[in-house]
Amino acid sequence: MGVRMLACVILGFLAVAINCDEAPNITADATTITTTRKPIPYQDSNICKLCKCEDTKVNCYDQSITTFFTLNEWEDIIDLKPSTVDLSENRFTNITVIADLTIEVLNLSRCSIEFIQSGSFRDLQEMRVLDLSHNKLTTDKLSPHAFEGRFAPEEYEPLASMRILNLAYNDLHSLNQDLFEHMPELEELDLSGNPLTTIDHVTLVAISSLPMLKVLRLRSCELDEIPSKFLHTPRFLENLDLSDNKLTIVPRELEEAKDLIYLNLNQNPIEVIDFYSEDNPGFPRLHKLQELHMCNMPKLRSIGPKALAGLESVEKLHISFNPSLSYLDPKALARPDDIGESFDWPLVKELYLKSNNLTEVDTRLLSRWDLLEKVDVSDNPFLCDCSTQWMVDVLAPIVESKGSNATLMVCQEPIEMRGHTMKDLHDSHRTMRCVDKYGHRPEKDGAILLGTLIGVLLAVPIMLSLMLLWRRGYFAWLGLRPPADVSRAFYKRAPADDILY
């Protein structure tokens, strides 16, 4: 009996041991079963029910989506192999991890996004363009971890394909100095519309960490200066937009951008650009710059000699809609040659001087007007005299031949020329006179001389008639006696009883 009891106890322990040993495998199998999802056609996915999915494009524009898609929902469209995903104009505020997809362009603009989870884009290894503009991202909530790549034993892998990042019109007052550490190949960065006010040290470090940067947009960032060495590291920078800021002078730091091709300084409160001024210096030497924009600058009054001389290769010059710009020096673009005996000019192909306050465009501004491909100098209060005769004879035909309207080149002064167009003056072969140096108006002399002559011719017979009437006594009632009465009064006989002394 005792032996049987012992055998039963031993068998019981063995059974428990066997069950305990098999339990993990059972649990593991159960877990596998619960986590494995049955694949579905991408047409039946939740994403493609809410959005339009076709031709490797997912269009979710303005679909009132309030919650970002889950990882599983993204996995359901793997077979679609999407290259472009547009989720703009929706209402979600948080971004979570996206599945391993072939997305190249991802648009998340205008969605009120406030937070991006760490590693949200880590599996998008083919993504080239990411648009996060017009959201509510702040300096505190935009972490470098948001852009980290896949995990590796030593460090996170970069988002190697990323080339364009748009962070415009968020609420960024500064940038984390490591914000772009996972995007070493980034070529285009847009920070426009963020209230940076100034480029502090950490922001400078962040942007300086992008050695391959080619395009930088800082429009409407309330900047009043550009810090030293800001443009030193991005040595391949070609396109720089500093428009609509508070710059009062042309930044000297531009000389660090040796490869700059395009520069936009529109809507800045610059008043004077003068090569010889320390307070308002001209442009530094930018020998590769091809296109310059200085438009809609209400305070710009004067562009002096050699102010633009540093722009040796400029081809497109936009200086329009500056209502106070009344002086553009004839040698604004001229630079001394290597010998110093003469001047060289850039070969400008497109010149826009529309809607300024210029009274003339000097022929010396360019060396080869005939090489212009586009030109617009309309809507300026031109002085039409001998100094602008060349505009009538040469410039007006050039403007007309390039597709612009020369009838918009209208004379404002002198008064007798007001309203005449330079095209009409050219067609009528009009030769304009020189305005008097002291402001005299000889064109009015004829009227004055004619009036004087008429006055003299009328005054002589009138005076003769009055003299005749006076001699005949017609004005006696006025106390004006005729000459006969006066002469008789001189010889009146004296009385006989007058006593002589």
Could you tell me what each predicted segment is?
Residues 2-501:
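Extracellular leucine-rich repeat
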